Amino acid sequence: MASISYLLAPLVLAAVLQPTAGAPLDAPTESPAGETSGEEAETGSPDDALAVALESVLGATKLHKNEFLVEFQGEVKYDFLDRYKIPSLPAKCPYSNFGKDACLRRLLEGLLIYSVLLKRVEEEFPSSSILSEVRFYSNILIKELENKVRDRDQVMRLTSSQEEQLLKDTDYPDTFHRKMTAHGILYNLHYFLVDCRRVINKRAKHRESAGSRVVRAVTFYHPKKRS
């Protein structure tokens, strides 16, 4: 895979994600350039380290599309990977009837599965700088999620035998299928993150809207006294 230069160097992000106690972090003001309308970041995302880490992973995974198109010289369309079936992929966050904490838990459990699947990608592309960045930012995001979710001890984690089975299920004898599986893992990881971000941001906007209605109601029932 071709080398890349990403906006946030690993050491810079590591410093950013270790702020002084009480000092809030500024989340990215805009999503990485070039996202399609289905991937656009929605306003209202939480302004904290988790949001920064999530955007950083997405910035790394999004670079995969151009690299895929260059590798296949346009002969294979990128959305072909959407139809390429990979077993045991984690479920995405439903857009409705799903709370923020439930989505954060789904995101965490999904990332733990993808962290195993990325071993398959590493076997095919051992020198990939994209993969290195995806792993780095994913590990930061996992730590942030572990600090956010409730009852983290109840988070489902794969056993060693389950990890072995997962890698076995994605192992193919021919080179083409192994390579397409590796590409498919990065493709599905990106859109898994996109969908989770959309749900998280929706819940954040819903809370902001509810808080605004409460403030208006209090103001209405308790008008300022005339001097």
Swiss-Prot record:
Residues 24-45 are annotated as: Disordered. After induction, highly expressed in spleen. Can also be expressed in kidney after incubation with PHA. It is found in: Secreted. Induction: By LPS and PBS. Component of a hexamer of two molecules each of IL6, IL6R and IL6ST; first binds to IL6R to associate with the signaling subunit IL6ST. Cytokine with a wide variety of biological functions in immunity, tissue regeneration, and metabolism. Binds to IL6R, then the complex associates to the signaling subunit IL6ST/gp130 to trigger the intracellular IL6-signaling pathway. The interaction with the membrane-bound IL6R and IL6ST stimulates 'classic signaling', whereas the binding of IL6 and soluble IL6R to IL6ST stimulates 'trans-signaling'. Alternatively, 'cluster signaling' occurs when membrane-bound IL6:IL6R complexes on transmitter cells activate IL6ST receptors on neighboring receiver cells. This is Interleukin-6.
